[in-house]
Amino acid sequence: MKVIFLDFDGVLNCVKSKSRAPFSQFIWYVGLDSDKMRNLAKIVQETDAKIVLTTTWRDHYAIGAYKQEDPVGKYVNNKFRKVELKIYDKIEPGKRFNRGIGVKRWLEKHPEVTDFVILDDEEMGYYNDYDLFDPHFVKTFWDGHGLTENCVNAAIKILNGELGAYRDMEDLQEVYGII
């Protein structure tokens, strides 16, 4: 089984995002962008990978529920359905939970995983197991464009066994003025 460990903020949205997601009656988050959702769908279509949530939004999403009760869960469900995607699972809940530990625990419980990719704009939660995670990591940028076509191509390669960490150099140059 191939798996995409998915963060939302900085991957499926970015600082330039216009869409909004309901958090409560009075508070709205930056939403999930349709173009980035289509990019995610391309990865799934070309690799048949399953999506496992690592995002902090995971606490609002009920895995396997036909009807989401939480407004954020409803929003996420609708966005994923529009591009014919399903969320397979999520790592353990917790607001300040180290994502790297969550991914490692999830992988330990699922020995059937043959390949995986991590799509995230933050690497800090993965440093403790750098050797394990780095070859599977595709770094996106909140200040850049999120899940770009370059990131999509890198994720597909990693899921198809061509390991190698990827940081979008075009975004690095645009956002930070460096290469």
Where are the language model's segments positioned?
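Active-site neighborhood of HAD-like aspartate-dependent phosphohydrolases
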Residues: 1-48
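Structural motif
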Residues: 3, 50, 115-117
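Short His-Asn-centered micro-motif
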Residues: 6, 54-57, 119-121
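Short catalytic/ligand-binding loop motif for oxyanion handling, primarily in non-cytosolic enzymes
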Residues: 13-15, 60-64, 125-129, 147
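Acidic-and-aromatic substrate-binding clefts and catalytic sites of carbohydrate-active enzymes
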Residues: 30-31, 60-63, 94-97
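Well-ordered, non-membrane alpha-helical segments in soluble/globular domains
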Residues: 30-40, 66-76, 100
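Substrate-recognition element of Asp-dependent hydrolases with the DxDx(T/V) motif
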Residues: 44-67
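C-terminal cap/substrate-recognition subdomain and adjoining C-terminal extension
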Residues: 70-179
